[in-house]
């Protein structure tokens, strides 16, 4: 019975995450269409694309905590109701300010990530948590759904009507969660400040947050900037750019459970070190690529490593912070979201300063190298020599 309930709630919450991420990411794939109707500069575009990440990151901490207090059902339901307003406002946007305001509150769709990673592990034994969280993380595919479907639909019915169609989906899932959400979910009522005090003293939280800042940050950042970047720098058609961006997102999403499985079967930190070495290579490839073929190889390498890395990290979070899982999940996932905020701005700034975005990708490789040192430190403190696992 409990196993059946766990499977059902995992499915329900994963689909809810799909819908949340569809809303969170709707602006990026439609930007090539939006900028034809709204007068925006390239600098404004980079800010508009990055803004949804702010609230989508910061709210992950209270959302994770509230999930332990009231349960996933009510956090999901309330989030969907709130999302109806910025989606409608976006469909009416006529100025950069309106785009920024609606994008900011669309961040609620990204914040719900911490709801499931806090709730789902309650339904599964410890040895299955990595896989369960990996499956839930596949809800990130919502970003790819918007990338794949929004541009061709917008080409037929217009971007405003495309955005308004999301109102139906969001309202439907609010109703589904209200009816089928689990009111009997186990609650964990540890005072927030007590959790924060405990977490602040644990260096593992800082390491995991930094690693997720890179892996999930890369996932979010590439999903945000790729559609517009491919159109501007390689002259790719708007719909084709959306599809290519969707492939990046889908690949990372489907590989996330693989990361969870690897974390369940092997030492997650050791596997993560291998993953980051390959990611660094991918970043270097992007840093030297001037042709679309080489750029594609670099992007796919980053996509694979980001997806597997995301799954590995969220295998480790509940293992290290069982009593403070909600807050720890929120903090780590918040840092991952913020990791997606800065790269589009940095890429635009570096491109304006140097005439090329190559240096920005090299920064990713440098951040990855620093992460490797922290992983080695954690591994040696937890398990001893790297020669033994």
Curated annotation (Swiss-Prot):
The keyword ATP-binding does not apply. CDD domains: MFS_NRT2_like. It is found in: Cell membrane. Induction: Positively regulated by the two-component system NreB/NreC. Keywords: Cell membrane, Membrane, Nitrate assimilation, Transmembrane, Transmembrane helix, Transport. Disulfide bonds: none annotated. GO terms for cellular component: plasma membrane. It is a multi-pass membrane protein. Its main location: membrane. The chain crosses the membrane at residues 14-34, 45-65, 69-89, 97-117, 139-159, 161-181, 211-231, 246-266, 268-288, 294-314, 331-351, 353-373. InterPro entries: MFS (IPR011701), MFS_dom (IPR020846), MFS_trans_sf (IPR036259), NO3_transporter (IPR044772). GO terms for molecular function: nitrate transmembrane transporter activity. GO terms for biological process: nitrate assimilation. Probably required for nitrate uptake under anoxic conditions. Also possibly involved in excretion of nitrite produced by the dissimilatory reduction of nitrate. Belongs to the major facilitator superfamily. Nitrate/nitrite porter (TC 2.A.1.8) family. This is Probable nitrate transporter NarT. It comes from Staphylococcus aureus (strain JH9). The gene is narT.
């Amino acid at each position: 019975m409990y196993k059946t309930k766990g499977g059902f709630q995992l499915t329900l919450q994963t689909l809810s995450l799909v819908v949340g991420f569809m809303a969170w990411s709707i602006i990026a794939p439609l930007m090539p269409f939006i900028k034809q109707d709204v007068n925006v500069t390239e600098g404004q575009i980079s800010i508009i694309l990055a803004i949804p990440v702010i609230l989508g990151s910061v709210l992950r901490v209270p959302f994770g905590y509230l999930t332990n207090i009231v349960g996933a059902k009510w956090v999901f339901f309330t989030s969907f109701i709130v999302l109806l307003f910025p989606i409608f406002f976006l469909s009416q946007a006529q100025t950069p300010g309106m785009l920024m305001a609606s994008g900011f509150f669309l961040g609620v769709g990204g914040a719900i990530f911490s709801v499931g990673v806090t709730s789902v592990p309650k339904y599964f034994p410890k040895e299955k948590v990595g896989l369960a969280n990996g499956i839930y993380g596949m809800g990130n595919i919502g970003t790819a759904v918007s990338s794949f479907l929004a541009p061709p639909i917008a080409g037929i019915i217009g971007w405003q009507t495309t955005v308004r169609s999301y109102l139906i989906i969001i309202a439907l899932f609010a109703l589904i969660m209200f009816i089928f959400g689990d009111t009997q979910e186990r609650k964990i009522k540890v005072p927030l400040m007590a959790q924060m005090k405990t977490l602040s003293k644990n260096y593992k939280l800082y390491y995991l947050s930094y690693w997720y800042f890179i892996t999930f940050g890369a996932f979010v950042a590439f999903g945000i900037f790729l559609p517009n970047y491919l159109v501007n720098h390689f002259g790719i058609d708007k719909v084709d750019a959306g599809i290519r961006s969707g492939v990046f997102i889908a690949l990372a999403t489907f590989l996330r459970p693989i990361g969870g499985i690897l974390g369940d079967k092997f030492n997650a930190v050791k596997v993560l070190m291998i993953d980051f070495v390959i990611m660094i290579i991918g970043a270097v490839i992007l840093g030297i690529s001037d042709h679309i073929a080489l750029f594609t190889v670099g992007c796919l390498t980053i996509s694979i490593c980001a997806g597997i890395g995301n799954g590995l990290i969220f295998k480790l979070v509940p293992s290290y912070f069982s009593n403070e899982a909600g807050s720890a999940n929120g903090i780590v996932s918040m840092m991952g979201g913020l990791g997606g905020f800065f790269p589009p701005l940095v890429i635009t700034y570096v491109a304006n300063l140097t005439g090329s975005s190559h240096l920005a990708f090299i920064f990713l490789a440098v951040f990855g190298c620093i992460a490797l040192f922290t992983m080695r430190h954690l591994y040696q403190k937890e398990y001893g020599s790297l020669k033994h696992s």
